[in-house]
UniProtKB/Swiss-Prot annotation:
Places the protein is found: Cytoplasm
Superkingdom per UniProt: Archaea
Stated role: Specifically methylates the uridine in position 2552 of 23S rRNA at the 2'-O position of the ribose in the fully assembled 50S ribosomal subunit.
Annotated S-adenosyl-L-methionine binding sites: 51, 53, 69, 85, 108
Enzymatic reactions: uridine(2552) in 23S rRNA + S-adenosyl-L-methionine = 2'-O-methyluridine(2552) in 23S rRNA + S-adenosyl-L-homocysteine + H(+)
Biological classification of the source: Archaea, Methanobacteriati, Methanobacteriota, Stenosarchaea group, Methanomicrobia
Gene Ontology annotations for the cellular component aspect, listed alphabetically: cytoplasm
Entry's EC annotation: 2.1.1.166
Keywords: Cytoplasm, Methyltransferase, rRNA processing, S-adenosyl-L-methionine, Transferase
Protein name: Ribosomal RNA large subunit methyltransferase E
GO terms, molecular function: rRNA (uridine-2'-O-)-methyltransferase activity
Keyword Cytoplasm among record annotations: yes
Organism per entry: Methanospirillum hungatei JF-1 (strain ATCC 27890 / DSM 864 / NBRC 100397 / JF-1)
Pfam families: FtsJ
Repressor is among the record's keywords: no
């Protein structure tokens, strides 16, 4: 672990709390500022490895929690995991078998970053569209979603896409986001629930 990690307060706090990555601190902050998960919600985590968000979700809800990732996830008590592409119809069928209903979806998935921002952002938007496709198939009407993306020329387009699917949409930049990062979270509440093929406020971390 490089020295920059040793100086990273979010990383140190996550490690001290037993979480698998600093991303756990982001989710805790996001939900504290945007309470979109209820105590009995069934939550689906897309792009869940290494599992830090699953750990946080397990603390927040007594509902069914399922994590999906291309990579294996070490076991977490009370959490089910699926190895596979979350847009794969076979994986969608597996999720349906494990979850009676999906009240919330979280997605912290990110492409492997090349360092070329426009290219990386375009690939992130593709992942966002895939996650929205899953929501349209599985998310219960009135459900909520938290999704990571990256600011860039296509971000407004994505934001408007999400607004077509949810009654309330806002953006949130976590305090624990690294300096210079274009990372931005979309907080979407009250899914309209069309369940068809894919198809207001804006704040920063001080909200």
């Amino acid at each position: 672990m490089g020295s920059q990690w040793g100086k990273d307060k979010a990383y140190l706090k996550a490690k001290q709390s037993g979480y698998r990555s600093r991303a756990a601190m982001k989710l805790k902050e996001i939900i504290q500022k945007n309470p979109v998960i209820r105590p009995d919600d069934n939550i689906l985590d897309l792009g869940a490895a290494p599992g830090s968000w699953l750990q946080v979700l397990r603390e927040m809800t007594n509902g069914v929690i399922v994590g999906v990732d291309l990579n294996p996830i070490l076991p977490i008590e009370g959490v089910r995991t699926i190895i596979g592409d979350f847009s794969d119809p076979v994986v969608i069928a597996q999720i349906r078998e494990l979850m009676p209903e999906v009240n919330g979806i979280v997605c912290d998935a990110s492409p492997k970053l090349s360092g070329q921002r426009s290219f990386d952002q375009a690939r992130a938007i593709e992942l966002n569209e895939m996650a929205l496709g899953v929501a349209r198939q599985l998310l219960k009407q009135g459900g909520n979603m938290i999704m990571k993306s990256f600011q860039g020329e296509d971000f407004s387009w994505l934001y408007n896409r999400v607004k077509q699917e949810f009654y309330s949409v806002r953006t949130y930049k976590a305090h624990t986001t690294r300096k210079g990062s274009t990372e931005m979270y979309i907080i979407a509440k009250n899914f309209i629930g069309t369940h068809q093929g894919l198809e207001e406020s804006v704040s920063d971390g001080s909200a």
